Amino acid sequence: MLNYVIKRLLGLIPTLFIVSVLVFLFVHMLPGDPARLIAGPEADAQVIELVRQQLGLDQPLYHQFWHYISNAVQGDLGLSMVSRRPVADEIASRFMPTLWLTITSMVWAVIFGMAAGIIAAVWRNRWPDRLSMTIAVSGISFPAFALGMLLIQVFSVELGWLPTVGADSWQHYILPSLTLGAAVAAVMARFTRASFVDVLSEDYMRTARAKGVSETWVVLKHGLRNAMIPVVTMMGLQFGFLLGGSIVVEKVFNWPGLGRLLVDSVEMRDYPVIQAEILLFSLEFILINLVVDVLYAAINPAIRYK
Protein backbone atom coordinates (compact mmCIF):
# COMPACT_ATOMS: atom_id res chain seq x y z
CA MET A 1 0.00 0.00 0.00
CA LEU A 2 2.80 2.43 0.91
CA ASN A 3 4.56 1.83 -2.41
CA TYR A 4 1.29 2.46 -4.24
CA VAL A 5 0.76 5.77 -2.42
CA ILE A 6 4.35 6.87 -3.13
CA LYS A 7 3.97 6.04 -6.83
CA ARG A 8 0.74 8.01 -7.01
CA LEU A 9 2.36 11.00 -5.28
CA LEU A 10 5.31 10.90 -7.68
CA GLY A 11 2.81 10.84 -10.53
CA LEU A 12 1.66 14.27 -9.38
CA ILE A 13 4.80 15.87 -10.82
CA PRO A 14 4.19 15.28 -14.56
CA THR A 15 0.45 15.82 -14.12
CA LEU A 16 0.87 19.21 -12.46
CA PHE A 17 3.49 20.20 -15.05
CA ILE A 18 1.09 19.44 -17.91
CA VAL A 19 -1.69 21.33 -16.12
CA SER A 20 0.61 24.32 -15.55
CA VAL A 21 1.52 24.45 -19.25
CA LEU A 22 -2.11 24.27 -20.35
CA VAL A 23 -3.22 26.86 -17.81
CA PHE A 24 -0.41 29.23 -18.78
CA LEU A 25 -1.39 29.01 -22.46
CA PHE A 26 -5.09 29.35 -21.62
CA VAL A 27 -4.78 32.51 -19.54
CA HIS A 28 -2.57 34.19 -22.12
CA MET A 29 -5.17 33.46 -24.81
CA LEU A 30 -7.91 35.23 -22.85
CA PRO A 31 -9.10 38.35 -24.66
CA GLY A 32 -8.23 41.62 -22.99
CA ASP A 33 -5.05 43.28 -21.75
CA PRO A 34 -4.34 43.11 -17.99
CA ALA A 35 -2.24 46.26 -18.21
CA ARG A 36 -5.13 48.23 -19.73
CA LEU A 37 -7.58 46.92 -17.12
CA ILE A 38 -5.24 47.78 -14.24
CA ALA A 39 -4.24 51.17 -15.63
CA GLY A 40 -7.88 52.18 -16.03
CA PRO A 41 -9.99 53.46 -18.93
CA GLU A 42 -8.46 56.96 -18.79
CA ALA A 43 -4.84 55.79 -19.14
CA ASP A 44 -2.95 56.63 -22.33
CA ALA A 45 -0.69 54.30 -24.30
CA GLN A 46 2.45 55.41 -22.45
CA VAL A 47 0.98 54.59 -19.03
CA ILE A 48 -0.32 51.24 -20.27
CA GLU A 49 3.11 50.34 -21.64
CA LEU A 50 4.70 51.29 -18.32
CA VAL A 51 2.27 48.99 -16.49
CA ARG A 52 3.08 46.19 -18.94
CA GLN A 53 6.76 46.56 -18.14
CA GLN A 54 6.09 46.52 -14.39
CA LEU A 55 4.05 43.33 -14.75
CA GLY A 56 6.62 41.67 -17.03
CA LEU A 57 4.12 41.34 -19.87
CA ASP A 58 6.49 42.99 -22.32
CA GLN A 59 8.80 39.96 -22.22
CA PRO A 60 8.57 37.07 -24.71
CA LEU A 61 6.02 34.40 -23.84
CA TYR A 62 8.61 31.66 -23.35
CA HIS A 63 10.53 33.90 -20.94
CA GLN A 64 7.35 34.55 -18.93
CA PHE A 65 6.67 30.81 -18.81
CA TRP A 66 10.17 29.96 -17.61
CA HIS A 67 9.95 32.65 -14.94
CA TYR A 68 6.57 31.28 -13.83
CA ILE A 69 7.70 27.62 -13.69
CA SER A 70 11.04 28.28 -11.99
CA ASN A 71 9.38 30.37 -9.29
CA ALA A 72 6.54 27.86 -8.81
CA VAL A 73 9.03 25.03 -8.23
CA GLN A 74 10.53 27.12 -5.43
CA GLY A 75 7.09 27.70 -3.92
CA ASP A 76 6.82 31.27 -5.18
CA LEU A 77 3.49 31.75 -6.96
CA GLY A 78 4.24 35.38 -7.76
CA LEU A 79 2.40 38.60 -7.02
CA SER A 80 -1.18 39.42 -7.85
CA MET A 81 -1.30 41.90 -10.72
CA VAL A 82 -4.22 43.70 -9.09
CA SER A 83 -3.47 43.83 -5.37
CA ARG A 84 0.33 43.41 -5.64
CA ARG A 85 0.12 40.99 -2.72
CA PRO A 86 1.72 37.52 -2.85
CA VAL A 87 -0.61 35.07 -4.57
CA ALA A 88 -0.08 32.59 -1.73
CA ASP A 89 -1.44 35.16 0.73
CA GLU A 90 -4.43 35.91 -1.50
CA ILE A 91 -5.30 32.21 -1.71
CA ALA A 92 -4.65 31.54 1.98
CA SER A 93 -7.05 34.30 3.02
CA ARG A 94 -9.81 32.77 0.86
CA PHE A 95 -9.13 29.06 1.36
CA MET A 96 -10.79 28.39 4.72
CA PRO A 97 -14.22 29.89 3.85
CA THR A 98 -14.33 27.69 0.74
CA LEU A 99 -13.11 24.61 2.63
CA TRP A 100 -15.68 25.00 5.42
CA LEU A 101 -18.45 25.67 2.91
CA THR A 102 -17.45 22.52 1.00
CA ILE A 103 -17.31 20.38 4.15
CA THR A 104 -20.66 21.69 5.38
CA SER A 105 -22.29 21.05 2.02
CA MET A 106 -20.75 17.59 1.73
CA VAL A 107 -21.74 16.47 5.23
CA TRP A 108 -25.44 17.23 4.90
CA ALA A 109 -25.54 16.06 1.28
CA VAL A 110 -23.98 12.67 2.11
CA ILE A 111 -26.18 12.09 5.16
CA PHE A 112 -29.39 13.09 3.39
CA GLY A 113 -28.47 11.47 0.07
CA MET A 114 -27.43 8.12 1.54
CA ALA A 115 -30.47 7.99 3.83
CA ALA A 116 -32.79 8.74 0.91
CA GLY A 117 -31.02 6.17 -1.27
CA ILE A 118 -31.21 3.43 1.38
CA ILE A 119 -34.89 4.13 2.04
CA ALA A 120 -35.63 4.08 -1.69
CA ALA A 121 -33.82 0.76 -2.12
CA VAL A 122 -35.43 -0.95 0.88
CA TRP A 123 -38.94 0.20 -0.14
CA ARG A 124 -38.28 -0.17 -3.85
CA ASN A 125 -41.17 0.61 -6.23
CA ARG A 126 -43.27 1.95 -3.36
CA TRP A 127 -44.12 5.50 -2.38
CA PRO A 128 -40.89 6.17 -0.35
CA ASP A 129 -38.87 5.15 -3.42
CA ARG A 130 -40.89 7.33 -5.78
CA LEU A 131 -40.83 10.31 -3.42
CA SER A 132 -37.06 10.07 -2.83
CA MET A 133 -36.24 9.74 -6.51
CA THR A 134 -38.59 12.59 -7.45
CA ILE A 135 -36.79 14.86 -4.99
CA ALA A 136 -33.43 13.61 -6.30
CA VAL A 137 -34.32 14.36 -9.93
CA SER A 138 -35.53 17.81 -8.89
CA GLY A 139 -32.25 18.47 -7.07
CA ILE A 140 -30.20 17.52 -10.12
CA SER A 141 -32.38 19.47 -12.55
CA PHE A 142 -32.57 22.75 -10.61
CA PRO A 143 -29.64 25.07 -11.50
CA ALA A 144 -27.51 26.12 -8.53
CA PHE A 145 -27.74 29.84 -9.28
CA ALA A 146 -31.54 29.69 -9.54
CA LEU A 147 -31.83 27.72 -6.29
CA GLY A 148 -29.52 30.17 -4.55
CA MET A 149 -31.51 33.20 -5.65
CA LEU A 150 -34.77 31.48 -4.66
CA LEU A 151 -33.44 30.72 -1.16
CA ILE A 152 -32.20 34.30 -0.79
CA GLN A 153 -35.57 35.69 -1.85
CA VAL A 154 -37.55 33.46 0.53
CA PHE A 155 -35.38 33.18 3.64
CA SER A 156 -33.50 36.49 3.52
CA VAL A 157 -35.63 39.03 1.69
CA GLU A 158 -39.17 37.86 2.52
CA LEU A 159 -38.73 36.20 5.93
CA GLY A 160 -35.51 37.86 7.08
CA TRP A 161 -34.37 34.70 8.88
CA LEU A 162 -30.88 34.26 7.42
CA PRO A 163 -28.07 36.56 6.20
CA THR A 164 -26.85 36.44 2.62
CA VAL A 165 -23.43 38.10 2.63
CA GLY A 166 -20.34 37.19 4.65
CA ALA A 167 -18.92 34.12 6.38
CA ASP A 168 -18.68 35.31 9.97
CA SER A 169 -21.14 32.97 11.71
CA TRP A 170 -22.74 29.57 11.22
CA GLN A 171 -25.93 31.23 9.94
CA HIS A 172 -24.01 32.49 6.91
CA TYR A 173 -23.28 28.89 5.87
CA ILE A 174 -26.87 27.64 5.77
CA LEU A 175 -28.11 29.02 2.45
CA PRO A 176 -24.84 28.58 0.48
CA SER A 177 -24.36 25.02 1.76
CA LEU A 178 -27.95 24.10 0.89
CA THR A 179 -27.46 25.52 -2.59
CA LEU A 180 -24.08 23.89 -3.14
CA GLY A 181 -25.02 20.49 -1.72
CA ALA A 182 -28.43 20.05 -3.34
CA ALA A 183 -27.14 18.47 -6.54
CA VAL A 184 -24.64 16.32 -4.60
CA ALA A 185 -27.39 15.01 -2.31
CA ALA A 186 -29.47 14.13 -5.36
CA VAL A 187 -26.60 12.29 -7.03
CA MET A 188 -25.75 10.46 -3.80
CA ALA A 189 -29.38 9.38 -3.37
CA ARG A 190 -29.62 7.90 -6.86
CA PHE A 191 -26.19 6.28 -6.67
CA THR A 192 -26.82 4.80 -3.20
CA ARG A 193 -30.17 3.41 -4.30
CA ALA A 194 -28.66 1.70 -7.35
CA SER A 195 -25.85 0.23 -5.26
CA PHE A 196 -28.19 -0.99 -2.50
CA VAL A 197 -30.64 -2.58 -4.92
CA ASP A 198 -27.80 -4.80 -6.19
CA VAL A 199 -26.61 -5.63 -2.67
CA LEU A 200 -30.06 -6.49 -1.30
CA SER A 201 -30.39 -9.37 -3.75
CA GLU A 202 -27.06 -11.00 -2.80
CA ASP A 203 -26.95 -14.45 -1.17
CA TYR A 204 -25.34 -13.23 2.06
CA MET A 205 -28.27 -10.85 2.62
CA ARG A 206 -30.76 -13.71 2.28
CA THR A 207 -28.61 -15.85 4.58
CA ALA A 208 -28.59 -13.14 7.25
CA ARG A 209 -32.38 -12.86 7.06
CA ALA A 210 -32.74 -16.65 7.28
CA LYS A 211 -30.72 -16.61 10.51
CA GLY A 212 -33.32 -14.35 12.07
CA VAL A 213 -31.27 -11.13 11.99
CA SER A 214 -33.48 -8.04 12.10
CA GLU A 215 -34.01 -6.24 8.82
CA THR A 216 -32.49 -3.02 10.17
CA TRP A 217 -29.31 -4.82 11.21
CA VAL A 218 -29.16 -6.69 7.89
CA VAL A 219 -29.33 -3.41 5.98
CA LEU A 220 -26.91 -1.45 8.16
CA LYS A 221 -24.30 -4.13 8.88
CA HIS A 222 -24.31 -6.42 5.87
CA GLY A 223 -25.73 -4.14 3.19
CA LEU A 224 -24.14 -0.80 3.99
CA ARG A 225 -20.54 -2.01 4.09
CA ASN A 226 -20.74 -3.81 0.75
CA ALA A 227 -22.69 -1.04 -0.95
CA MET A 228 -20.24 1.64 0.19
CA ILE A 229 -17.45 0.91 -2.32
CA PRO A 230 -19.08 2.53 -5.38
CA VAL A 231 -20.65 5.16 -3.12
CA VAL A 232 -17.24 6.18 -1.73
CA THR A 233 -16.04 6.67 -5.30
CA MET A 234 -18.88 9.07 -5.95
CA MET A 235 -18.29 10.83 -2.62
CA GLY A 236 -14.68 11.52 -3.53
CA LEU A 237 -15.55 12.81 -6.98
CA GLN A 238 -18.33 15.01 -5.64
CA PHE A 239 -16.09 16.44 -2.91
CA GLY A 240 -13.51 17.38 -5.53
CA PHE A 241 -16.16 18.99 -7.69
CA LEU A 242 -17.54 20.90 -4.70
CA LEU A 243 -14.14 22.18 -3.64
CA GLY A 244 -13.33 23.48 -7.09
CA GLY A 245 -16.81 24.03 -8.42
CA SER A 246 -18.34 26.42 -5.92
CA ILE A 247 -17.74 29.37 -8.25
CA VAL A 248 -21.40 29.97 -9.14
CA VAL A 249 -22.59 29.67 -5.53
CA GLU A 250 -19.85 31.97 -4.23
CA LYS A 251 -20.75 34.52 -6.88
CA VAL A 252 -24.46 34.40 -6.01
CA PHE A 253 -23.85 34.76 -2.26
CA ASN A 254 -20.84 37.07 -2.60
CA TRP A 255 -18.89 34.46 -0.62
CA PRO A 256 -15.29 35.44 0.29
CA GLY A 257 -13.80 32.21 -1.05
CA LEU A 258 -11.61 30.80 -3.81
CA GLY A 259 -14.43 30.65 -6.35
CA ARG A 260 -15.18 34.34 -6.01
CA LEU A 261 -11.46 35.12 -6.14
CA LEU A 262 -11.16 33.16 -9.39
CA VAL A 263 -14.08 35.01 -10.97
CA ASP A 264 -12.63 38.38 -9.98
CA SER A 265 -9.19 37.34 -11.25
CA VAL A 266 -10.56 36.27 -14.63
CA GLU A 267 -12.43 39.57 -14.96
CA MET A 268 -9.22 41.51 -14.25
CA ARG A 269 -6.98 39.06 -16.19
CA ASP A 270 -4.89 38.49 -13.05
CA TYR A 271 -2.73 35.75 -14.58
CA PRO A 272 -0.74 34.65 -11.48
CA VAL A 273 -3.86 34.17 -9.36
CA ILE A 274 -5.72 32.26 -12.11
CA GLN A 275 -2.76 29.95 -12.68
CA ALA A 276 -2.25 29.28 -8.97
CA GLU A 277 -5.93 28.59 -8.29
CA ILE A 278 -6.33 26.11 -11.14
CA LEU A 279 -3.14 24.34 -10.09
CA LEU A 280 -4.50 24.16 -6.54
CA PHE A 281 -7.83 22.75 -7.71
CA SER A 282 -6.01 20.13 -9.80
CA LEU A 283 -3.82 19.12 -6.85
CA GLU A 284 -6.84 18.86 -4.56
CA PHE A 285 -8.74 16.70 -7.02
CA ILE A 286 -5.81 14.31 -7.50
CA LEU A 287 -5.21 13.97 -3.75
CA ILE A 288 -8.90 13.37 -3.07
CA ASN A 289 -8.93 10.54 -5.62
CA LEU A 290 -5.86 9.05 -3.94
CA VAL A 291 -7.63 9.14 -0.57
CA VAL A 292 -10.66 7.43 -2.14
CA ASP A 293 -8.46 4.64 -3.53
CA VAL A 294 -6.90 4.11 -0.10
CA LEU A 295 -10.36 3.98 1.49
CA TYR A 296 -11.28 1.12 -0.84
CA ALA A 297 -8.87 -1.17 0.98
CA ALA A 298 -10.21 -0.05 4.37
CA ILE A 299 -13.82 -0.76 3.38
CA ASN A 300 -13.14 -4.00 1.50
CA PRO A 301 -10.03 -5.95 2.64
CA ALA A 302 -10.24 -8.01 -0.57
CA ILE A 303 -8.93 -4.97 -2.46
CA ARG A 304 -5.18 -4.56 -2.36
CA TYR A 305 -2.90 -2.20 -4.28
CA LYS A 306 0.60 -3.07 -5.37
From Swiss-Prot:
Cytoplasmic compartment spans? 1-8, 124-134, 190-228, 299-306
What are the alphabetically sorted keywords of the record?
Cell inner membrane, Cell membrane, Membrane, Transmembrane, Transmembrane helix, Transport
* Record-linked CDD domains: TM_PBP2 (cd06261)
* One GO cellular component term: plasma membrane
UniProt signal peptide:
none
Instruction: Name the Pfam families for this protein.
Output: BPD_transp_1 (PF00528), BPD_transp_1_N (PF19300)
Provide the transmembrane region boundaries. 9-29, 103-123, 135-155, 169-189, 229-249, 278-298
Q: Which SUPFAM superfamilies match?
A: MetI-like
Which residue ranges are assigned to the Periplasmic compartment in the record's topology?
Answer: 30-102, 156-168, 250-277
User: For this UniProt entry, what is the primary localization, expressed as one broad class?
Assistant: membrane
In which domain of life is the source organism classified?
Bacteria
Localization per record: Cell inner membrane
Q: Where is the ABC transmembrane type-1 domain?
A: 95-292
Membrane topology is: Multi-pass membrane protein
For whether the record's keyword set contains Transcription regulation, the answer is no
One GO BP annotation of this record: transmembrane transport
**Could you list the residue ranges forming a coiled coil in this record?**
none
Kindly state the subunit structure of this protein. The complex is composed of two ATP-binding proteins (GsiA), two transmembrane proteins (GsiC and GsiD) and a solute-binding protein (GsiB).
Belongs to which family?
Answer: Belongs to the binding-protein-dependent transport system permease family.
NCBIfam families on file: PRK15081.1
The free-text function statement in the UniProt record for this protein reads: Part of the ABC transporter complex GsiABCD involved in glutathione import. Probably responsible for the translocation of the substrate across the membrane.
Q: Tell me the protein's name.
A: Glutathione transport system permease protein GsiC
Q: Please name the source species.
A: Escherichia coli O6:H1 (strain CFT073 / ATCC 700928 / UPEC)
Q: What is the lineage of its organism?
A: Bacteria, Pseudomonadati, Pseudomonadota, Gammaproteobacteria, Enterobacterales
Gene label: gsiC
